[in-house]
Amino acid sequence: MATYAIGDIQGCYDSLQRLLERCAFDPASDRLWLVGDLVNRGPKSLATLRLIKSLGPAALTVLGNHDLYLLMVAEGGAKFRGKDDTLQEILDAPDCAELLDWLRHQPICHTEGEYCLVHAGLLPQWTASRARELAREVEITLQGPDFREFILNLWGSEPAGWSDNLSGWARLRVIVNAMTRMRFCTLDGVMEFKVKGKLSNAPAGHIPWFDLPDRKSAKSVLVTGHWSALGLKVTPNLLALDSGCLWGGHLTAVRLEDRQVFQVDCSPTEALPLKR
């Protein structure tokens, strides 16, 4: 049995199919770990969502910011932001309700052995096990009767830092933003959300979350996506797998058992023009 961790798909269904062939993925014996952002901007978000759902226990995904955005739009908590959004086909699908119910029952953080699977990253105050506890707070709300109220209160970037004293929607918003949106932080873990580019674009006083000194999750292996400008980054304690398929780059998988990397080029019909 092999476990393949795969970067952000974002509706690039054709590239995903070619990557699974490249890996010789067998759903009867292998597993997929998906870093989230299954949908949006690529041309086949509906097909992607249906495929991952159909794999059952052979596929484990955490939620990314685009997945949560889909849930927000469906509940009226957000409006489409631009012409690059490709979620309408999901909302119009006959199985939309079933797909969205499945999506909101996925975790936002998964820990297993030395690994921690999360879309964006973890704040420096959190061990992987603590992050899993905090993620569960979000998941209970996301899957429970307060789901719609939660979605309507999720949007926003404040508070930008963690405190154990946080409560209510503010507490859940910080957890979600760290795990699904974070890239750069100050040394004390205050998040910055405006800059999305390369490491050289770091705002003054900010560094990548994974370079924060004394980060409590440093002994775990973090498996992440979200940061296409960072590209594939493989270190002993970090597998950053968003290699920019949507932007004409690659879709990447790493086999966890031996760290072998598998990649396919983005299908020409799926790539968006790079934003400079």
UniProtKB/Swiss-Prot annotation:
The keyword Hydrolase applies. GO terms for molecular function: bis(5'-nucleosyl)-tetraphosphatase (symmetrical) activity. It comes from the Bacteria. It catalyses: P(1),P(4)-bis(5'-adenosyl) tetraphosphate + H2O = 2 ADP + 2 H(+). Its EC number is 3.6.1.41. Belongs to the Ap4A hydrolase family. This is Bis(5'-nucleosyl)-tetraphosphatase, symmetrical. It comes from Dechloromonas aromatica (strain RCB).
